[in-house]
Every structure is written in C-alpha cells, then in structure tokens.
Amino acid sequence: MLGKIVTIAAVAAGGMILSKQLRKSRESGKATIEESIEVNVPVSAAYNQWTQFEEFPNFMKNICEVRQLDDTHLHWRAEIAGKEEEWDAEITEQIPDERIAWHSTSGAEHAGVVTFHKISDSTTRIMLQMDYSPKGFIEGLGDAVGAVKLQVRTDLQGFKDFLEAHGSETGGWRGSVARH
C-alpha cells in the first residue's frame, strides 16, 4: 500500500513539474539550453572541425543536411519531433579558436553561441548556449521534458566521438566574422 501511495505521489509531482515547465515555456515563448563537453584535441582542431558545418549530419542524429551558402549563411534540414524542418541561419560572429555565434533568419526561431576553451594543449572545453522558441504542443512538450537538452548533449557527445575517432579535424575555416 505504501508503495502505491509513493508511486501516486511521484506521478502527481512529476505532473506538476511538467505542467509548470509547459506553462513557463508558453509564457516566455523562449527556452535556453546550456551544455558543455571536453574534447581530447587542441582548441584549434575543435574549432576547425566545428566550422565544417556540412559535416554535422555525421555526428548530429537529427540533422539531415547543412549547406554552407557563403561565409556567413547556412541552410539546414533536420527532423524535429518526427517531421522535416528547414531553416536558414546567419553567422553573426566568428573568432578563430574562440567563438561562433548565429541566429536563424527563417524557419525555426533560434540563436546561439559556441565557445572553445583551452584546458590543456590537448584538451578543449566546448560550451554551447542556444535560445529557441518551441513551436506547437509537441515541441513545447519536448522542451518541458528535457528532450531538446538531451539531444544537444547527445550531439556534443557525437561531435567529441567523431573528432577523437578521426584524430584531427576534417578541414577548417580560419576567417573572422565581425560581430553584427
């Protein structure tokens, strides 16, 4: 009997937390994710690989395609919540070995920054912050239960595994984009 009461209480508490998260997401319209990972490569290798956007489908499960249109514009195609989505993004700042910032210009509304921090000559901490606006009930629910945060964490782990397995970056763009 006590076990049933504890289970019912846990389900009720979980429902209250989920309801609160859904309400918070709906009220603000925005959600923020912050994740980091340490990669066993020099900072230049981590940064260079991150600039190879067209390689993202190799380690980001939901990304189907990324086309780099020019130095600052990308077209993305992904599967989100079981349906295909497309959007364009603009790189708003790029400093070699330090940071890359972006925002969407069409489709799913989001913006973010990824930064690269030298831990040692052979270890880099990658920190990602992304703000986005979940669309509709399914994406809002995914946000509320932490599915998007888990996907970002999985994608960062995929990047780490991809880069460490290759031993070095597959290319790199060392140009800068002034903040705008």
Language-model features: where?
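Beta-strand/loop substructures that line and gate deep hydrophobic ligand-binding cavities in soluble
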Residues: L2-I5, E93, H103-D161, A165, ...
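Hydrophobic ligand-binding cavity/cleft-lining segments
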Residues: G3-R77, G158, E164-G167, A178-H180
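Intrinsic-disorder/low-complexity, polar/charged segments enriched in Ser/Thr/Lys/Arg/Asp/Glu/Gln
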Residues: K30-S36, H73, E86, R99, ...
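Organelle targeting or membrane-anchoring low-complexity regions in eukaryotic organelle proteins
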Residues: Q68-D71, E79, M127, L150
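Short, hydrophobic/aromatic-rich segments at coil-to-beta transitions
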Residues: Q68-H75, Q94-W102
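Short acidic, glycine-rich loop/turn motifs
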Residues: A78-G82, S104-S106
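Short, cysteine-centered beta-strand-loop-beta hairpins and adjacent loop/turn segments enriched
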Residues: A81-E85, P134-F137
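Phosphoinositide-binding peripheral membrane targeting modules
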Residues: D88-E90
